Amino acid sequence: MSNENSAVTKHAGVKKVVLAYSGGLDTSAIIPWLKETYDDCEIIAFCADVGQGDAELEGLYEKAIASGASECHIVDLKEELVADYIYPTIATGAIYEGTYLLGTSMARPIIAKAQVEVARKVGADAVCHGCTGKGNDQVRFEGCFAALAPDLKVIAPWREWEMVSREDLLDYLAERNIATSASATKIYSRDANAWHISHEGGELEDPWNEPSKGVWTMTVAPEDAPNQPEYVALELEQGKITKVNGEALSPYNALMLLNEVAGAHGVGRIDITENRLVGMKSRGCYETPGGTVMFAALRAIEELVLDKTSREWREQIGTKMAHLVYDGRWFTPLCESLLGASKPLADLINGEVVVKLYKGQASVVKKRSPNSLYSEAFATFGADDVYNQKDAEGFIRLYSLSSRIRALNNQK
């Protein structure tokens, strides 16, 4: 793509814009594009540290300035993300379409909120994101902006510029001598945070292609994992992991430790084709090692402490919450309502769990809770003196009464 072909008419009316900046392919191209597109516009780069790792943050400030930003604000959101967004979400049992633990989705509201806060701080009149016009994230970001700062103009370059592919972006950056770690042969779209990393694009766009070993970055291949299992002991209070192997840890540090331990055993990989909010299907490979262990631990205690109807209610809350988070509707009354409804149930999730990690599997092998409704004395198949089995007869007659009446009517 030549400079002449990529030229655009200068727009006025935006004096200062805060860009959600990652230093990746898309946002690296956006800074020069904004300067070329908007007349006399100051670009402020904003980067959310959500636990994506030091490698992604290293040199980010310098790169943003070299690309044309006047400032770069790097905001540490790691602990807040885990404590105030991830834990409340997984405590509802939210899991999208049965497999996806919502790693990208849960991070978007806190990033958008922090971006708005930076925009207010610097007096910006616009915010900008690098989300594709085909994806979910454009809806998530702009839904949050609408709820938090409806007065700010939103700039979405993927819906405006003439570039249509990541290959176009590579050419655009090469023409301007702006460095990027992406290449034509390694062109996955990745998004990482403390909870997970996602991989999309490139060879993965064909669901008949098995992901190569080079796709995965957070977990070892299960077949290459240790031949001996590892056991991890977790303590939970009100739906939160408070100790790992007896060590008290903050929510973020507990997750980091579990990521390391579970990732070494190949735990947390999924390869799915999901229904996007915008109507199309997309394929994603996700790695959520620590989160997979945490989710299993929560469900294990839940099995002990929730009665049947409470668990059915939690499942309804979890399904609705998963769609709400996936669809970018965190800052809504419905989200507050779902979180409020799930809290009395989450408060019961106290106890201890031992998880066995082996060759890609995280299996709960021990669990106990002070709130447990399970009683060995009642459930035993051996002799007991607490349960009169004759009591079941009257219960069964009442429980099956409607079926009995229907059958009698059919015999007439």
Curated annotation (Swiss-Prot):
Pathway: Amino-acid biosynthesis; L-arginine biosynthesis; L-arginine from L-ornithine and carbamoyl phosphate: step 2/3. The keyword Ribonucleoprotein does not apply. GO terms for molecular function: argininosuccinate synthase activity; ATP binding. GO terms for cellular component: cytoplasm. Pfam families: Arginosuc_syn_C (PF20979), Arginosuc_synth (PF00764). ATP binds at residues 20-28, 48, 130. InterPro entries: Arginosuc_syn_C, Arginosuc_syn_N, Arginosuc_synth, Arginosuc_synth_CS, Arginosuc_synth_type_1_subfam, AS_cat/multimer_dom_body, Rossmann-like_a/b/a_fold. PROSITE patterns: ARGININOSUCCIN_SYN_1, ARGININOSUCCIN_SYN_2. L-aspartate binds at residues 132, 136-137. Keywords: Amino-acid biosynthesis, Arginine biosynthesis, ATP-binding, Cytoplasm, Ligase, Nucleotide-binding. It catalyses: L-citrulline + L-aspartate + ATP = 2-(N(omega)-L-arginino)succinate + AMP + diphosphate + H(+). It comes from the Bacteria. It is an enzyme of class 6 (ligase). GO terms for biological process: argininosuccinate metabolic process; L-arginine biosynthetic process; urea cycle. It is found in: Cytoplasm. Belongs to the argininosuccinate synthase family. Type 1 subfamily. This is Argininosuccinate synthase. The lineage of its organism: Bacteria, Pseudomonadati, Pseudomonadota, Gammaproteobacteria, Alteromonadales.
